[in-house]
């Protein structure tokens, strides 16, 4: 009999002053693992399902998906079909990676199961973040499932507000914070770190992570408790063991055919060829040996056995000799070469090379209309700075489908958050910025090359960044109690090592950090050593960057958009826009400029050239002019009255042309001279605050050779018109006092 949905199994704990609830049995009971995790009004449903693989894919097929349901925040999707369709958003992809990275290493090697973890945000209270809940929920669901999982882990977010650490801050607290780090930890060690900071010292980050790890221990404990209450029996899994005789034979053949020498070749592609040559010789020998020739499983296992030997040899050399694959010691950064301004039509460009890793990074400036607009649980969001990281297959000499991968989105996000703290405020530099990092070749740390190249390209474009930013990737080799931290790791060192720790920042402090750890027991001592060594490497890279370009260029590229701001009276905004946007469209058509108007009257103009900018500014300012005393205007008659005519001398600026000023001769009826809707050339003869008087008579006198004298057009007295008699009699008017009973 199925469990009553109203009585799920529940565990709770207090974390960061908030209650977190994890329960199972309410929702997806046919999933192999399922939890509902809640904090405040934010709820995430996480499910786990698995099925045996029909054949060995050569890798562990773990799929993690995170989705934000718009109904969770009481919103309807903005897509044409009004439903969540298409590929995941950038945020959904990044959160899925946050979940994947700490749980993937906790599955045993050789697990022949297709595993899918789905996390869905089904309620969002606009206060409590869902990403860290999803991470913890994924671990809890895996703990309940039959899958072998060496967890649990828990996730948390650390902010620093007013000098005090805050765990799982609200959105408002995050906006006030100078630190924003998401992390995952088991009971005694960190397993994943991702975050950004505003020039925070290494010591503060270490302190924050250690503090945060201790704060989330209750989340680890209640997962064990939930497992005891309702966990499914774990499947029997026996890790694959290679034939000892085969392992010994492969090792002997590899060493005899130059494996150690191949691993000392400093160039990546040459080393790859040398290793392949060793493998080919080993396979050739085994296929000629009757003991192994017909054993397909043994021949298939050779690649993994050789990989294990390579890892053992490289790690032993680093530990025993302090020498790395390319001959460097443990703290040396690879040689750096930089070229800026190499693309003639780009707004800013830089080619950054560090060893065999090279990135072409290009900065583009746009207008406010180029901002990225996104539909999210918190409402419509705009993004003024974007960094896109591309990793084409040719960068590593491979043939693969060309599409944007999750890895590329993740690396771009890390580089973006590392550069964002040095960007000028919107009010000081209102351009939209897009930086694209094209990886030309890669041998490790390409994301950090994107950070360095991004900083250089922004300075080349003339963006007034507050300081240059550099990044470096750190590695770790840990054997027993002995550990060695590696600066500026190669791709092979990333694969063979125990940690990938990327740190970016300025000379003042850290701006971005990302860490993935493959082992348990990452001590504070290791963290401190890695952070200090990374700082030394970062400062060295910043010195090399300063040799190419030390500060932002004083002027923008002549191909960049030109910008100006105009402040107008808010009352005339509707005039500038025009009916149906007619006037704005006319400005754009005439100049190619984009015009953005705020309710405050601030008008931001972006144009392709300086000439177009000036023309657009004049066209906007035309609607906000004030008339000059004594100046002639081709006015339009808007209203005819007994005392004269109301004319529009400028947009939204009206003046009275008194009947005595309509002509050089006496005018009995204003309509005899003024025609509604027609143009009339007039001179402004008086400005008294918002009251303006104009004269057609003064213009006519000037045409007859009589210059205008302000005294000639002084405000008329009633006697100026002479004796007009009884107006009721002469004009046929009626005495308003004798109108009879109008009821």
Swiss-Prot record:
Residues that hold Mg(2+) according to the record: 494, 500
Regions of compositional bias (Basic and acidic residues) in chain numbering: 712-743
Localization per record: Cytoplasm
Gene3D superfamilies recorded: GHMP Kinase, N-terminal domain, K Homology domain, type 1, Nucleic acid-binding proteins
EC number: 2.7.7.8
GO-annotated cellular components: cytosol
Matches recorded under InterPro entries: ExoRNase_PH_dom1 (IPR001247), ExoRNase_PH_dom2 (IPR015847), ExoRNase_PH_dom2_sf (IPR036345), KH_dom (IPR004087), KH_dom_type_1 (IPR004088), KH_dom_type_1_sf (IPR036612), NA-bd_OB-fold (IPR012340), PNPase (IPR012162)
Family, similarity comment: Belongs to the polyribonucleotide nucleotidyltransferase family.
Protein known as: Polyribonucleotide nucleotidyltransferase
Natural source organism: Desulfovibrio desulfuricans (strain ATCC 27774 / DSM 6949 / MB)
């Amino acid at each position: 009999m199925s469990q009553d949905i109203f009585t799920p199994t529940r565990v709770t704990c207090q974390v960061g002053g908030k209650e977190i609830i994890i329960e199972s049995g309410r929702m997806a009971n046919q999933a192999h693992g399922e939890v509902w995790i809640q904090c405040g009004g934010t709820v995430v449903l996480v499910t786990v399902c698995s099925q045996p693989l029909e054949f060995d894919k050569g890798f562990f097929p773990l799929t993690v998906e995170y989705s934000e349901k718009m109904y969770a925040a009481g919103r309807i999707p903005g897509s044409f079909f009004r439903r969540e369709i298409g590929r995941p958003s950038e945020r959904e992809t990044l959160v899925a990676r946050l979940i994947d990275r700490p749980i993937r290493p906790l599955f045993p090697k050789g697990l022949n199961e297709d595993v899918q973890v789905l996390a869905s945000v089904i309620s969002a209270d606009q206060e409590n973040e869902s990403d860290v809940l999803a991470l913890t929920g994924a671990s809890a669901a895996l703990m309940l499932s039959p899958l072998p999982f060496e967890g649990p882990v828990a996730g948390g977010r650390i902010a620093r507000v007013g000098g005090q650490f805050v765990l799982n801050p609200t959105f408002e607290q995050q906006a006030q914070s100078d630190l924003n780090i998401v992390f995952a930890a088991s009971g005694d060690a960190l397993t994943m770190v991702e975050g950004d900071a505003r020039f925070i010292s290494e010591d503060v980050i270490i302190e924050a992570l250690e503090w945060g790890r201790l704060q989330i221990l209750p989340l680890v404990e209640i997962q064990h408790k939930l497992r005891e209450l309702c966990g499914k029996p774990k499947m029997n899994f026996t890790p694959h063991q290679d034939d000892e005789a085969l392992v010994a034979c492969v090792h002997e053949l590899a060493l005899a055919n130059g494996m150690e020498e191949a691993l000392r070749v400093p160039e990546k592609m040459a080393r790859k060829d040398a290793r392949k040559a060793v493998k080919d010789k080993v396979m050739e020998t085994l296929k000629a040996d009757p003991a192994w020739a017909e054993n397909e499983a043994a021949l298939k296992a050779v690649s993994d056995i050789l990989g294990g030997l390579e890892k053992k040899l490289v790690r032993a050399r680093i530990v025993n000799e302090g020498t790395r694959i390319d001959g460097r010691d443990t703290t040396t950064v690879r040689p750096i070469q930089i070229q800026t301004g190499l693309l003639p039509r780009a707004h800013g460009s830089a080619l950054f090379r560090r060893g065999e890793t090279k990135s072409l990074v290009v900065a583009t400036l746009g207008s406010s209309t180029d901002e990225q607009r996104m539909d999210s649980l918190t409402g419509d969001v705009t993004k003024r700075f974007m960094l896109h990281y591309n990793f084409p297959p040719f960068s590593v000499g491979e043939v693969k489908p060309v599409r944007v991968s999750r890895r590329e989105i993740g690396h771009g996000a890390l580089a973006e958050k590392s550069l964002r703290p040095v960007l000028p405020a919107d009010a000081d530099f209102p351009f939209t910025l897009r930086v694209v990092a094209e990886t030309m070749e890669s041998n490790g740390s390409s994301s950090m090359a994107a950070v360095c190249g991004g900083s250089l390209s922004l300075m080349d474009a003339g963006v007034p960044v507050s300081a240059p930013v550099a990044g470096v990737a750190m590695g770790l080799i840990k054997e027993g109690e002995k550990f060695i931290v590696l600066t500026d790791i190669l791709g092979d060192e990333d694969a063979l090592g125990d940690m990938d720790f990327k740190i970016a920042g300025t000379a003042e402090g850290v701006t971005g950090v990302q860490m993935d750890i493959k082992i348990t027991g990452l001590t504070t001592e290791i963290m401190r050593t890695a952070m200090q060594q990374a700082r030394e490497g970062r400062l060295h890279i910043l010195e090399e960057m300063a040799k190419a370009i030390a500060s932002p260029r004083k002027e923008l590229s002549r191909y960049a958009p030109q910008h100006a701001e105009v402040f107008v009276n808010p009352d005339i905004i509707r005039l500038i826009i025009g009916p149906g946007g007619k006037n704005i469209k006319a400005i754009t058509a005439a100049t190619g400029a984009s015009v953005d108007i705020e309710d405050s009257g601030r008008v931001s103009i972006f144009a392709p050239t300086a000439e177009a900018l000036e023309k657009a500014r004049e066209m906007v300012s035309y609607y906000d002019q004030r008339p000059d005393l004594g100046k002639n205007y081709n006015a339009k008659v808007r209203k005819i009255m007994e005392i004269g005519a109301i004319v529009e001398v400028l947009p939204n600026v009206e003046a009275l042309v008194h009947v005595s000023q309509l002509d050089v001769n006496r005018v009995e009826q204003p309509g005899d001279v003024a025609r509604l809707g027609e143009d009339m050339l007039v001179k402004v003869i008086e400005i008294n605050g918002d009251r303006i008087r104009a004269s057609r008579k003064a213009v006519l006198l000037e045409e007859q050779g009589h210059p205008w004298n302000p005294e000639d057009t002084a405000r008329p007295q009633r006697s100026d018109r002479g004796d007009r008699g009884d107006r009721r009699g002469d004009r046929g008017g009626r005495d308003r006092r004798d109108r009879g009973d109008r009821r």
